[in-house]
Amino acid sequence: MLIDQFDRKINYLRISVTQRCNFRCLYCMPKIPFDYQPKENLLSFEELFLFVKATIDEGIEKIRITGGEPLLRKDLSIFIKMISDYKSDIDLAITTNGFLLKDFAKDLKNAGLKRLNISLDTLDHKKAKTLAQKDVLDSVLSGIDEALNLDLKVKLNTVALKNLNDDELISLLEFAKSKKAQIRFIEFMENTHAYGKLQGLKRDEIIQILSQKYQIQLIKKDEKAPVSIYKADDYEFGIIDPHSHEFCDSCNRIRLSAEGLLIPCLYFDEASSIKEAVRKGDIKAAVEILQEVLRNKPEKNKWSVVDNETSSRAFYQTGG
């Protein structure tokens, strides 16, 4: 079992398999980065799996594959199959922008994937092109339909932004309901790589907008994640509210970057590399590095909205 210095059980591993993305979303990576790691600096899927297997043995129960855009990484379905074959009942999911999903959904399902989180910030073609700086909406919607047709469980993620999609929150909720998918509205998390003029909606503002049409009722607050579950009449949706709901006391996650950096907290600059240990085949040493990272995992993040601090680490490097 993995326990940090504050007696928190760590059972959730988020793996960023690539920094690259085919969108240039205003809230994440509006400009082409100059800090992409060359391919040789990235851990191969075989190397990643050696470490992942060890973390499962140590108590990891949930794995989320992220990016960048994970579907840009060649042979991702092979990596999914490695994990699924090793532990078929592990909670294994991918977060994707959905653009390539129509082409890859079947392979992912056959590899053992059961769940997807898909970004959907707007149903308007013009706004989608503004947000992603690319004409993406038709491909994303096709990807969502393909995943649902294959009986993959789908959650839709919407970053709620003032003057961009705040007039669509009800429409997005109703779209998700029509697809029998759960939507989760996300408070914008400030970071130094985002477009500087963006302003996000807070939880209460999201609820206020949805309340214009629906009776909103809080039904569940997950203490191990910054998500609260609500009902709009008979439909359940989520709000991921890091501004409004501090969950550090029960944080259960650790992050691994594509180049082998173990990151204890999204808003914490320190990180430790397992690359050398893994490439030497010394998985015991890699696990010891993981345990040391957990001993140094902070009690709380260093994000202070009052002081207008932002994350200096790019979310496309850590998967958000």
From Swiss-Prot:
Q: Which CDD domains does this chain map to?
A: Radical_SAM, Twitch_MoaA
| Record Pfam families | Fer4_12, Mob_synth_C, Radical_SAM
Give start and end of each Radical SAM core domain: 5-225
Classification via PROSITE patterns: MOAA_NIFB_PQQE (PS01305), RADICAL_SAM (PS51918)
- Which keywords accompany this UniProt record? 4Fe-4S, GTP-binding, Iron, Iron-sulfur, Lyase, Metal-binding, Molybdenum cofactor biosynthesis, Nucleotide-binding, S-adenosyl-L-methionine
Name the enzyme's class.
Answer: lyase
Tell me the residue numbers annotated for binding S-adenosyl-L-methionine. 27, 68, 119, 189
HAMAP family with a match to the protein in the record: MoaA_B
For this entry, the protein name equals GTP 3',8-cyclase
